[in-house]
Amino acid sequence: MATVPTALAGRHFLKELDFTEEEFRGLIELAAELKAAKRAGTETRYLQGRNIALIFEKTSTRTRCAFEVAAADQGASTTYLDPAGSQIGHKESVKDTARVLGRMFDGIEYRGDSQTKVEELAAFAGVPVYNGLTDDWHPTQMLADVLTMTEHSDRPLREITFAYLGDARFNMGNSYLVTGALLGMDVRIVAPKSYWPAQEVVDRAHRLAAASGARITLTEDVAEGVRGAGFVVTDVWVSMGEPKEVWAERIKALAPYAVTMDVLRATGNPDVRFLHCLPAFHDLGTKVGQEIFEAHGLDSLEVTDEVFESAHSVVFDEAENRLHTIKAVLVATLA
């Protein structure tokens, strides 16, 4: 039977900044226990009779599946609302939607552009609200990534070094920087300066680091940024919903920050691991990949296929861990 942290009962999960280091670590530990129980066939169903609404204004594979399977494993039911299936923000205000769904459901997940929208849902729903991704933060992904790091390193979190390469201005860059700072890790943001997180986010990270002992580096130098790293991380250069017109500019700016085998060798760590939240443009196996090849002559973007398919890559362990960590959030807040 897992040890459920009662301090998180009834809490929202909106961004990493809302949690203490102890609370965040507690969710990682709970996820590891739930994962082990699922594999052993000894999982306890803590959420029998619960109902969870899943609002997706942005499409998803991993996040939707993780919430649905996590809920089902725990005995809860889910209702999926896509943009065509709900009136949120169109015919009905976020505030009113929150108050309606809060009367019917025990928890609400939201995935879309606006952090303001998920915060407003939380303010008026009266039940726990979960951020499945916004433009600013991706907290459920951070739980999965940190769990994956603990599984693939024999070091404690405070001794783990990871480097994030690429566009760090939005949710993934913000979340990696703040999460690493919160947990006392050695976190490096490696990108052109114009692609660094906003100064407000950097300042918040430095304040967290002062308390946790984290080491924070922001650099344009790839060799400096990855030296000694145990994990190299990246994300897509063009985010969901962005127009194709931005591709050329992004590719020109970020091409030196693509994760190649040379980048992994530059860590000096033969056991370095590669993480990516997915989907990844590492080959020509997608429609978007084909369009990029036709327009720019590139067979990969943020990571080469050689790295993606190598023994260094743990991206599918990371993807699986979305399930176990989201389950931990549901159990901790609703059990």
Swiss-Prot record:
It comes from the Bacteria. Pfam families: OTCace (PF00185), OTCace_N (PF02729). L-ornithine binds at N171, D235, S239, M240. It is found in: Cytoplasm. GO terms for molecular function: amino acid binding; ornithine carbamoyltransferase activity. One of its GO terms (biological process) is arginine biosynthetic process via ornithine. It is an enzyme of class 2 (transferase). The keyword Glycosyltransferase does not apply. Its EC number is 2.1.3.3. InterPro entries: Asp/Orn_carbamoyltranf_P-bd, Asp/Orn_carbamoylTrfase, Asp/Orn_carbamoylTrfase_sf, Asp_carbamoyltransf_Asp/Orn-bd, Orn/put_carbamltrans, OTCase_ArgI. Pathway: Amino-acid biosynthesis; L-arginine biosynthesis; L-arginine from L-ornithine and carbamoyl phosphate: step 1/3. Coiled coil: none annotated. Keywords: Amino-acid biosynthesis, Arginine biosynthesis, Cytoplasm, Transferase. GO terms for cellular component: cytoplasm. Carbamoyl phosphate binds at S60, T61, R62, T63, Q87, R111, H138, P139, T140, Q141, C277, L278, R322. Its main location: cytoplasm. It catalyses: carbamoyl phosphate + L-ornithine = L-citrulline + phosphate + H(+). Reversibly catalyzes the transfer of the carbamoyl group from carbamoyl phosphate (CP) to the N(epsilon) atom of ornithine (ORN) to produce L-citrulline. Belongs to the aspartate/ornithine carbamoyltransferase superfamily. OTCase family. This is Ornithine carbamoyltransferase.
